[in-house]
């Protein structure tokens, strides 16, 4: 069932789906290059509920305590090579997003003047990864931005390298969830500031990666 929300976006509200063994192996992260999507969804929305209703849901069981893949692994072992391929979204080389579903700025910390992540970036990258895994059927556009410090052309190149670094990190972490064609990158350099560049705070806001998800 698909309904339109207050923003005019179409939202899937349910329906049923039958998964075969290969599909379950994929969503429980048992296939090479995949991650446990069930665990990510459970934890993400568990944290949301706990934050919204702290008195009703002060805590919830850890995912590892409620998700047991022993039976699934046993069935897969018995099936051997007689397992079909999982049903996964396909993305064409033309990765242009024609319908934007979500747009968000992420402050991913890089080494100054480089496209290398700082240790502080890890938590943000993990959160971004989880969000994109949950929305696994959507295309992703990674937009790199800088402040106005330094040479204009060098900033354009730097924003491209940083956007590519995010793309490469996601694809290496889970090739199955980020196949070729899902992620596209665009470099903007200092051309699209969201805050004045006259202050350190403004510059910090402009050094960002914008993630767009859509169809």
Regions found by a protein language model. Give the residues of each.
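Second-shell loop/turn segments in exported
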Residues: 30-38, 109-118, 149-156
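Periplasmic OmpA-like peptidoglycan-binding domain that tethers envelope proteins to the cell wall
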Residues: 146-215
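Periplasmic peptidoglycan-binding/tethering modules of Gram-negative envelope proteins
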Residues: 57-139, 176
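Structural recognition of the beta-strand scaffold that forms the well-ordered cores
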Residues: 109, 116, 139-141, 184-186, ...
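Sec-exported extracytoplasmic/periplasmic mature domains
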Residues: 50-54, 130-137, 168-176, 214
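Secondary-structure end/capping motifs
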Residues: 1-55
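Solvent-exposed, polar/charged alpha-helical surfaces in well-ordered, non-transmembrane soluble domains
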Residues: 43, 47, 119-130, 140, ...
